[in-house]
């Protein structure tokens, strides 16, 4: 490798290593450098079509941190917007808003501090945190885009394209940060690599084994996250274009939506269902494996029998409808 020391007048030096492990994350340049050297690395890249906006706050003196068990949640999905509070130390916290790229009016409004606060204060679950008498902002809103699901393949026809090089975590398989799986995937991937390196000294065997285990153990997590991205894009389009009424009805589509509504409602009210979902989120088991539990399956079925209307009501947090929020932002100076 040729190393450039940016802190020492860009002085260059060449070094050799037994192994190169790329753990540089979503901004990794290694795959580009390898391609420039003629290494064929295939890449799957899917745009989640969303953007995040974050603003940091600090609770005012004398204001206690709100309960995590309040009736109106501090994290939720209104359809046109997802939101969440992430507490820190000493009264500091971050508020993150996730918007579809197509929500141009909302995106424009929320870029300003006034617009960000005004929109968020229409959500009852956020008022205990950012009401005018609760907290003060410590930053302006700032955004992050280019949210892609990325999977890189280092084998071609079953043979490694580069030896003694291993990309781990986001450098190899990147998912939407909305699902909070990045750190868990990175940790799991590091353990996979450790096992591979311990079991063989042969560079070809190592490369093939690492690729196969990555596909076996990380692949299902990546695919589940990608499906959620696609579902989010579809739901956003339906809401924005009012395609719900135009959509052809089918038993399969009805069952899928009814099951999702029932699962979400059951997770809000039944702790053992919630724990099953958390196991999937934290990668303690394969995606959806908790649904093999007969008790959870019976519970979700009982919720389905209650009807979608009641289950949707439990899932959706209080907040303005999309038409109402668009009208609201038109009043912001």
Model regions and ranges:
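A short, ordered amphipathic alpha-helix with a cationic face
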Residues: 20-21, 184, 249-253
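Short alpha-helix boundary/capping motifs
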Residues: 58-62, 147, 238-239, 291
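A structural signal for short secondary-structure junctions
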Residues: 89, 159-160, 255-258
């Amino acid at each position: 490798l040729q190393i450039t020391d940016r802190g020492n007048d860009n002085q260059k030096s060449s070094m050799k290593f037994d192994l190169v492990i790329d753990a540089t994350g979503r901004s990794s340049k290694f795959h580009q450098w390898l391609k420039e050297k003629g290494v064929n690395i295939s890449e799957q890249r899917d745009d989640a079509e969303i953007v995040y906006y974050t603003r940091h706050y600090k609770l005012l003196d004398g204001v206690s941190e709100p309960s995590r068990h309040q009736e109106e949640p501090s994290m939720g999905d209104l359809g046109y917007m997802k939101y969440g509070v992430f507490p820190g130390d000493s009264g500091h916290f971050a508020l993150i808003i996730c918007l579809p790229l197509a929500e141009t009016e909302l995106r424009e409004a929320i870029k300003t501090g006034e617009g960000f606060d005004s929109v968020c204060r229409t959500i009852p679950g956020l008022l205990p945190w950012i009401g005018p008498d609760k907290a003060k902002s410590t930053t302006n809103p700032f955004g992050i885009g280019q949210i892609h699901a990325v999977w890189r393949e280092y084998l071609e026809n079953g043979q490694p394209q580069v030896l003694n090089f291993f990309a781990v975590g986001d450098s190899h398989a990147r998912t939407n940060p909305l699902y909070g799986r990045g750190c868990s995937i990175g940790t799991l991937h590091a353990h996979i690599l450790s096992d591979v390196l311990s079991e063989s000294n042969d560079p070809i065997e190592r490369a093939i084994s690492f690729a196969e285990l990555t596909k076996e153990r990380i692949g299902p997590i990546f695919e589940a996250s990608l499906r959620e991205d696609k579902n989010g894009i579809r739901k956003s389009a339906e809401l924005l274009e009012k395609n719900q009424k135009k959509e052809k009805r089918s038993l399969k589509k009805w069952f899928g939506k009814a099951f999702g509504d029932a699962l979400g409602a059951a997770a809000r009210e039944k702790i053992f269902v919630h724990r099953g979902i958390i196991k999937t989120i934290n990668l303690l088991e394969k995606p959806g494996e908790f649904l093999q539990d007969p008790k959870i399956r019976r519970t979700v079925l009982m919720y389905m029998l209650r009807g979608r209307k009641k289950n949707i009501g439990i899932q959706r947090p209080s907040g303005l409808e999309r038409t109402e929020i668009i009208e609201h932002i038109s009043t912001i100076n």
